[in-house]
Regions:
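Non-transmembrane alpha-helical segments in soluble domains
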Residues: 14-17, 26, 39-42, 65, ...
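Short strand-turn motif at the edge of the Rossmann-like AdoMet-binding core
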Residues: 52-54, 78-81, 109
Length: 255
């Protein structure tokens, strides 16, 4: 749906893709639609800017890449932190060796949303909502308010929880700064332990990425009282540590 003076609104995105004067599209839908809409846009001759996460599962990424290559379309993922000047400056410091050898990275996503998002009953979708279109490629389920915006992120049918919500941004920065091409293994443990709602994805999760020459730890808490989230990322090196989030960055160096 488009908004703004003079903009044309579409109930069916396929009609938008039929417009010959549209050169590019932005896909900012629930996650389970990202890859399919991106592929359809490429097939229609449009360049694509798609919100993260790019896909819901790995195979979708491979399909989208093949179609983008075949149609020679530009596809960019919305990991907008790369546009931040302080993220660019921090990258220069790390890649210049200012921190020495990086041996580990910690990614934090800590907040407290206890007791959760409630347990609303299944019911009828709101008037004006095309629920079949909203589901799209997802499994058929009865409508539930928590499966709509914004909380669809806590259901496996549509998303991957905070790992693919906030974790996607953090991992992109790690990849940009250090590279993840030597990734050997990923180990994850957690569950929905604390929140009393109908969500499915973990509210507590610890993930370790073995990247060959360094490790990355993702620490996610949705029900942690008293511990501030602080900086989203910490890069630990032999000469110092750099902590960074969207507000700025700070470096601690040995004397």
């Amino acid at each position: 749906t488009a908004v703004g003076d003079g903009a044309t609104a579409f109930q069916d995105f396929r009609k938008l893709l039929d417009c010959k004067d549209v050169q590019a599209v932005i896909v900012a839908t629930p996650d389970h639609w990202h890859a399919l809409m991106g592929m359809m846009a490429c097939a229609a001759g449009k360049d694509v800017y798609v919100e993260k996460p790019l896909t819901l599962f790995v195979g979708e990424g491979e399909w989208l890449q093949k179609i983008a290559d075949r149609t020679k379309r530009v596809v960019q993922v919305g990991t907008q932190q790369r546009s931040g000047l302080h993220y660019q400056k921090a990258r220069e410091l790390i890649r210049s060796g200012h921190l020495g050898t990086i041996s580990s990275v910690r990614m934090d996503a800590i907040r407290n949303v206890s007791p959760g998002f409630g347990n609303p009953a299944d019911g009828e979708p709101p008037v004006g909502m095309d629920y079949d279109s909203w589901l799209g490629p997802a499994p058929l389920r009865k409508y539930n308010p928590n499966r709509g915006l914004y909380h669809f992120r806590w259901f496996w049918d549509y998303s991957g929880g905070q790992m693919t919500n906030l974790g996607a941004h953090h991992l992109d920065i790690v990849d940009w700064y250090l590279g993840l091409d030597q990734l050997r293994s990923v180990t994850s443990i957690g569950g929905r332990f604390a929140l009393r709602d109908n969500g499915e994805t973990p509210d507590t999760q610890d993930v370790i990425f073995d990247c060959g020459k360094f490790t990355v730890a993702f620490v996610m808490r949705e029900a942690a009282r008293g511990e501030p989230s602080g900086f989203g990322l910490r890069f630990h090196g032999t000469k110092g540590t750099l902590a960074i989030d969207r507000r700025g960055f700070k470096v601690w160096a040995d004397p």
